[in-house]
Amino acid sequence: MSRSTKKGPYVDEKLFEKMQKLNKTGDRKVVKTWARASVITPEFVGHTIAIHNGKKFFPIFISEQMVGHKLGEFAPTRTFKGHGGMTKQETSLV
């Protein structure tokens, strides 16, 4: 179930304030954030945001196509190592 349209999209207040401040000054420095649930707004476009994935920060350049998506969608939290294959011991027995 999606968020109520009456409430509007969730945007982390501190992150939004930082982006507005950067837009006023014209700075393009990387902003670190843990707010993965925050929705990308048009104010974020053109900036680089380092999104935490639980272990480290992934720098993501925000483009216009990303508006409306959540920050966490662009920083994967899980790494797939592949399904179990044959080990050295198993191959020597065959």
Curated annotation (Swiss-Prot):
Q: Where is the signal peptide?
A: none
Q: Which UniProt keywords apply?
A: Ribonucleoprotein, Ribosomal protein, RNA-binding, rRNA-binding
List, alphabetically, the Pfam families matched: Ribosomal_S19 (PF00203)
**Annotated Gene Ontology cellular component terms:** cytoplasm; small ribosomal subunit
Q: Extract the GO molecular function terms from the UniProt entry.
A: rRNA binding; structural constituent of ribosome
User: Which PROSITE patterns does this entry report, sorted A to Z?
Assistant: RIBOSOMAL_S19 (PS00323)
Q: Which residues form a coiled coil?
A: none
GO biological-process terms attached to the record: ribosomal small subunit assembly; translation
What is the recorded function of this protein according to its Swiss-Prot or TrEMBL entry? Protein S19 forms a complex with S13 that binds strongly to the 16S ribosomal RNA.
* Family statement drawn from the similarity comment of this UniProt entry: Belongs to the universal ribosomal protein uS19 family.
Extract the NCBIfam families matched here.
Answer: rpsS_bact
What's this protein's name? Small ribosomal subunit protein uS19
